[in-house]
């Protein structure tokens, strides 16, 4: 039995609130249960130096957690003077995932900067961030088209992400913190709206997992992501 009494395949309630802030071209508050992440997408002219003159754009991401997003206060990374390895890993994951969804040639020499700030953490912050950032990205691209900056929509497909894992010997979907901290296997999966895989991050925290367990986890993720994409589409309609 899961602590929340959810079934193994059941995700937490997912809520996507668009236009959450006034200034960003795209802004979303995404909630996976008690995990809440603010995702903004800023449209900027120009590209990093390594892309100048190549006629293509760039999508990059930054990620952070507010000091009291967790049970006890954590020091701001700015105050420490450096980002943790975890932060760098997550923001690279978000950027890679979103770049897979965008035709960089159609974006032109423009950059979209995604900022994901965790307001409250209860497991699955990176998967929530990817899911919300995708919707913010769509709004930023639509803003650019409305301004005449882009003639064609560079978005190839929606993407979403969910965590899966083995908890007390059973494969489950969308782990909250109490499950994540005790899971024998922990995995984050990013997929397109058609179920194609963009990224898998999987680790055996305790006992190694079998090929059969891997396949069952991927099926759980595919089912969960399909439901999340439906919520993304409903929020954009």
Curated annotation (Swiss-Prot):
Q: What is its EC number?
A: 2.7.7.56
One BP annotation, GO: rRNA processing
Q: Which residues form a coiled coil?
A: none
Query: InterPro entries in the record, alphabetically?
Result: ExoRNase_PH_dom1 (IPR001247), ExoRNase_PH_dom2 (IPR015847), ExoRNase_PH_dom2_sf (IPR036345), PNPase/RNase_PH_dom_sf (IPR027408), Ribosomal_Su5_D2-typ_SF (IPR020568), RNase_PH (IPR050080), RNase_PH_bac-type (IPR002381), RNase_PH_CS (IPR018336)
- Catalysed reactions listed for this entry: tRNA(n+1) + phosphate = tRNA(n) + a ribonucleoside 5'-diphosphate
Identify the enzyme class: transferase
Function, as annotated, reads: Phosphorolytic 3'-5' exoribonuclease that plays an important role in tRNA 3'-end maturation. Removes nucleotide residues following the 3'-CCA terminus of tRNAs; can also add nucleotides to the ends of RNA molecules by using nucleoside diphosphates as substrates, but this may not be physiologically important. Probably plays a role in initiation of 16S rRNA degradation (leading to ribosome degradation) during starvation.
* Family under the similarity heading: Belongs to the RNase PH family.
Stated name of the protein: Ribonuclease PH
Q: Which gene encodes it?
A: rph
